[in-house]
Amino acid sequence: IMEKIKGYTSYIYLHVKGEPLIHPELDKILKIANSYNLNVNITTNARILKDKLDIIINNKIRQLNISLHSFDSLDEIEEILYVIDKISDSYISLRLWNNKDNSDILKLLERHYNKNITNDKRFTLGDNVFLDRDVLFSWPDINIDEISKYGTCKGGKNQLAILVDGTLVPCCLDNDGYNKLGNIFESDLESVLKSNNYRKIVNGFNNNILVSELCKRCGYIKRFKGGI
Protein backbone atom coordinates (compact mmCIF):
# COMPACT_ATOMS: atom_id res chain seq x y z
CA ILE A 1 0.00 0.00 0.00
CA MET A 2 2.76 2.46 0.92
CA GLU A 3 4.47 1.82 -2.39
CA LYS A 4 1.25 2.55 -4.30
CA ILE A 5 0.37 5.77 -2.48
CA LYS A 6 3.82 7.35 -2.48
CA GLY A 7 3.89 10.39 -4.73
CA TYR A 8 0.21 11.09 -4.05
CA THR A 9 0.38 12.13 -0.40
CA SER A 10 2.74 12.95 2.44
CA TYR A 11 0.14 12.17 5.11
CA ILE A 12 -1.59 9.02 6.28
CA TYR A 13 -4.25 8.66 8.96
CA LEU A 14 -4.39 5.26 10.63
CA HIS A 15 -8.13 5.13 11.13
CA VAL A 16 -11.40 4.70 9.32
CA LYS A 17 -13.47 3.35 12.16
CA GLY A 18 -12.12 1.49 15.14
CA GLU A 19 -9.18 1.84 17.49
CA PRO A 20 -5.74 1.87 15.80
CA LEU A 21 -3.79 1.33 19.02
CA ILE A 22 -5.14 -2.23 19.39
CA HIS A 23 -3.70 -3.35 16.03
CA PRO A 24 -1.27 -6.19 16.79
CA GLU A 25 1.24 -4.91 14.22
CA LEU A 26 1.04 -1.21 15.04
CA ASP A 27 4.79 -0.88 15.61
CA LYS A 28 5.57 -2.58 12.29
CA ILE A 29 3.07 -0.39 10.42
CA LEU A 30 4.56 2.78 11.90
CA LYS A 31 8.08 1.73 11.01
CA ILE A 32 7.04 1.03 7.41
CA ALA A 33 5.33 4.43 7.21
CA ASN A 34 8.41 6.12 8.66
CA SER A 35 10.61 4.38 6.08
CA TYR A 36 8.55 6.09 3.37
CA ASN A 37 8.86 9.45 5.18
CA LEU A 38 5.10 9.70 5.60
CA ASN A 39 3.54 11.96 8.22
CA VAL A 40 1.47 9.66 10.41
CA ASN A 41 -1.69 10.83 12.18
CA ILE A 42 -3.60 8.69 14.66
CA THR A 43 -7.11 9.21 16.05
CA THR A 44 -7.64 7.27 19.27
CA ASN A 45 -9.85 7.02 22.33
CA ALA A 46 -6.52 6.73 24.23
CA ARG A 47 -7.78 4.09 26.65
CA ILE A 48 -4.65 2.00 26.09
CA LEU A 49 -2.31 4.87 25.23
CA LYS A 50 -0.28 4.26 28.39
CA ASP A 51 0.35 0.65 27.33
CA LYS A 52 1.42 1.74 23.83
CA LEU A 53 3.49 4.73 24.91
CA ASP A 54 6.85 3.19 24.00
CA ILE A 55 5.62 2.46 20.47
CA ILE A 56 4.33 6.02 20.09
CA ILE A 57 7.52 7.61 21.40
CA ASN A 58 9.86 5.36 19.42
CA ASN A 59 8.18 6.10 16.08
CA LYS A 60 7.54 9.37 14.30
CA ILE A 61 3.91 10.36 14.85
CA ARG A 62 2.96 13.75 13.42
CA GLN A 63 -0.28 14.11 15.36
CA LEU A 64 -2.36 12.26 17.91
CA ASN A 65 -6.08 13.10 17.99
CA ILE A 66 -7.56 12.07 21.33
CA SER A 67 -11.31 11.95 21.95
CA LEU A 68 -11.83 13.26 25.48
CA HIS A 69 -15.57 12.59 25.31
CA SER A 70 -14.90 8.84 25.23
CA PHE A 71 -13.89 8.67 28.90
CA ASP A 72 -16.24 7.78 31.75
CA SER A 73 -14.60 9.85 34.48
CA LEU A 74 -12.39 12.87 35.11
CA ASP A 75 -9.84 10.62 36.82
CA GLU A 76 -9.36 8.73 33.56
CA ILE A 77 -8.86 11.96 31.64
CA GLU A 78 -6.39 13.25 34.23
CA GLU A 79 -4.36 10.05 33.96
CA ILE A 80 -4.22 10.42 30.17
CA LEU A 81 -3.02 14.03 30.49
CA TYR A 82 0.01 12.86 32.45
CA VAL A 83 0.69 10.24 29.77
CA ILE A 84 0.46 12.94 27.10
CA ASP A 85 3.02 15.02 29.00
CA LYS A 86 5.60 12.37 28.11
CA ILE A 87 4.99 12.78 24.36
CA SER A 88 7.09 15.72 23.18
CA ASP A 89 7.60 15.18 19.46
CA SER A 90 3.98 15.00 18.28
CA TYR A 91 1.11 17.44 17.96
CA ILE A 92 -1.69 16.52 20.37
CA SER A 93 -5.29 17.43 19.57
CA LEU A 94 -7.64 16.92 22.52
CA ARG A 95 -11.10 16.70 21.00
CA LEU A 96 -14.43 17.55 22.55
CA TRP A 97 -16.97 16.80 19.84
CA ASN A 98 -20.26 16.59 21.68
CA ASN A 99 -23.29 18.61 22.70
CA LYS A 100 -22.84 18.19 26.44
CA ASP A 101 -21.79 20.47 29.27
CA ASN A 102 -18.02 20.03 29.35
CA SER A 103 -17.35 22.48 32.18
CA ASP A 104 -15.79 19.86 34.49
CA ILE A 105 -13.43 18.68 31.75
CA LEU A 106 -12.48 22.26 30.89
CA LYS A 107 -11.71 23.02 34.55
CA LEU A 108 -9.48 19.95 34.68
CA LEU A 109 -7.62 21.09 31.55
CA GLU A 110 -7.22 24.60 32.98
CA ARG A 111 -5.67 23.21 36.16
CA HIS A 112 -3.37 20.80 34.36
CA TYR A 113 -2.08 23.30 31.80
CA ASN A 114 -2.43 26.44 33.96
CA LYS A 115 -4.53 28.20 31.31
CA ASN A 116 -7.77 30.14 31.18
CA ILE A 117 -9.58 28.47 28.29
CA THR A 118 -11.55 30.71 25.95
CA ASN A 119 -14.48 29.74 23.73
CA ASP A 120 -12.32 29.46 20.62
CA LYS A 121 -12.88 26.28 18.61
CA ARG A 122 -9.11 25.67 18.80
CA PHE A 123 -7.24 26.68 21.93
CA THR A 124 -3.52 26.20 22.62
CA LEU A 125 -3.02 24.42 25.94
CA GLY A 126 0.74 23.90 25.79
CA ASP A 127 3.66 23.17 23.49
CA ASN A 128 2.08 21.29 20.57
CA VAL A 129 -1.04 20.53 22.64
CA PHE A 130 -4.41 21.89 21.50
CA LEU A 131 -8.04 21.69 22.54
CA ASP A 132 -10.38 21.30 19.56
CA ARG A 133 -14.12 21.70 20.07
CA ASP A 134 -17.03 21.07 17.76
CA VAL A 135 -20.61 19.82 17.86
CA LEU A 136 -21.60 16.20 17.52
CA PHE A 137 -22.48 15.04 14.01
CA SER A 138 -24.48 12.08 12.74
CA TRP A 139 -22.56 9.39 10.88
CA PRO A 140 -23.71 8.56 7.36
CA ASP A 141 -26.28 5.76 7.26
CA ILE A 142 -27.81 4.55 4.01
CA ASN A 143 -30.89 3.35 5.93
CA ILE A 144 -31.96 6.74 7.31
CA ASP A 145 -33.98 9.48 5.60
CA GLU A 146 -32.19 11.82 3.24
CA ILE A 147 -30.70 14.87 4.98
CA SER A 148 -29.90 16.98 1.92
CA LYS A 149 -29.29 16.80 -1.83
CA TYR A 150 -26.92 19.75 -1.69
CA GLY A 151 -23.56 20.33 -0.08
CA THR A 152 -19.84 19.91 -0.48
CA CYS A 153 -17.13 17.88 1.21
CA LYS A 154 -13.38 17.29 1.21
CA GLY A 155 -13.90 13.58 0.58
CA GLY A 156 -12.17 12.48 -2.62
CA LYS A 157 -10.64 15.92 -3.09
CA ASN A 158 -8.33 16.05 -0.07
CA GLN A 159 -8.52 12.46 1.08
CA LEU A 160 -9.22 8.83 0.22
CA ALA A 161 -9.79 6.00 2.67
CA ILE A 162 -8.52 2.45 2.33
CA LEU A 163 -10.53 -0.24 4.12
CA VAL A 164 -9.06 -3.42 5.55
CA ASP A 165 -9.73 -5.41 2.36
CA GLY A 166 -8.16 -2.72 0.17
CA THR A 167 -11.42 -1.08 -0.90
CA LEU A 168 -10.95 2.60 -1.77
CA VAL A 169 -13.67 5.06 -0.74
CA PRO A 170 -13.79 8.90 -0.79
CA CYS A 171 -13.74 9.41 2.98
CA CYS A 172 -13.12 7.88 6.39
CA LEU A 173 -16.82 7.86 7.33
CA ASP A 174 -17.67 5.27 4.66
CA ASN A 175 -16.52 2.28 6.69
CA ASP A 176 -18.86 -0.14 4.88
CA GLY A 177 -17.47 0.71 1.45
CA TYR A 178 -20.73 2.01 -0.01
CA ASN A 179 -18.96 4.42 -2.38
CA LYS A 180 -16.43 1.90 -3.65
CA LEU A 181 -13.99 3.48 -6.09
CA GLY A 182 -11.72 0.49 -6.58
CA ASN A 183 -9.26 -1.67 -4.66
CA ILE A 184 -5.68 -0.70 -3.85
CA PHE A 185 -4.56 -4.33 -4.23
CA GLU A 186 -6.10 -4.66 -7.69
CA SER A 187 -5.43 -1.29 -9.32
CA ASP A 188 -3.30 1.83 -9.00
CA LEU A 189 -4.43 5.21 -7.71
CA GLU A 190 -4.10 6.88 -11.08
CA SER A 191 -6.82 4.68 -12.60
CA VAL A 192 -9.08 5.29 -9.60
CA LEU A 193 -8.66 9.07 -9.88
CA LYS A 194 -9.60 8.86 -13.56
CA SER A 195 -12.66 6.65 -13.00
CA ASN A 196 -16.16 7.92 -13.81
CA ASN A 197 -17.44 7.13 -10.32
CA TYR A 198 -14.71 9.20 -8.66
CA ARG A 199 -15.17 12.12 -11.06
CA LYS A 200 -18.95 12.17 -10.57
CA ILE A 201 -18.64 12.41 -6.79
CA VAL A 202 -15.92 15.08 -6.82
CA ASN A 203 -17.58 17.14 -9.58
CA GLY A 204 -20.76 17.00 -7.53
CA PHE A 205 -18.97 18.40 -4.48
CA ASN A 206 -17.44 21.14 -6.64
CA ASN A 207 -20.95 22.13 -7.74
CA ASN A 208 -22.57 21.81 -4.31
CA ILE A 209 -24.46 18.66 -5.34
CA LEU A 210 -24.40 15.40 -3.39
CA VAL A 211 -24.22 12.62 -5.97
CA SER A 212 -23.89 9.66 -3.62
CA GLU A 213 -26.94 8.40 -1.75
CA LEU A 214 -24.73 7.89 1.30
CA CYS A 215 -23.49 11.49 1.20
CA LYS A 216 -27.12 12.66 1.16
CA ARG A 217 -27.50 10.94 4.52
CA CYS A 218 -24.34 12.24 6.21
CA GLY A 219 -24.53 14.76 9.04
CA TYR A 220 -20.91 15.81 8.63
CA ILE A 221 -21.89 17.67 5.45
CA LYS A 222 -23.35 20.41 7.68
CA ARG A 223 -19.83 21.45 8.70
CA PHE A 224 -19.05 22.72 5.22
CA LYS A 225 -20.37 25.91 3.69
CA GLY A 226 -23.22 25.01 1.37
CA GLY A 227 -24.34 21.98 3.37
CA ILE A 228 -27.93 22.00 4.60
Q: Which residues fall in each region the model found?
A:
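Conserved glycine-rich "GG(E/T)P / GGGxP" loop and the immediately following alpha-helix
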Residues: 1-125
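Short hydrophobic/aromatic beta-strand element in the GNAT-like acyltransferase core
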Residues: 159
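Active-site-flanking alpha-helical
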Residues: 26, 171-172
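Short, small/polar residue-rich loop motifs at catalytic or cofactor-binding pockets
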Residues: 153-156
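Short, positively charged
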Residues: 128-148, 196-197
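Short, acidic, Ser/Thr-enriched surface-loop or helix-capping motifs
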Residues: 162-163
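Flexible mid-to-C-terminal extensions adjoining Fe-S/redox cofactors in radical SAM and related proteins
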Residues: 173-228
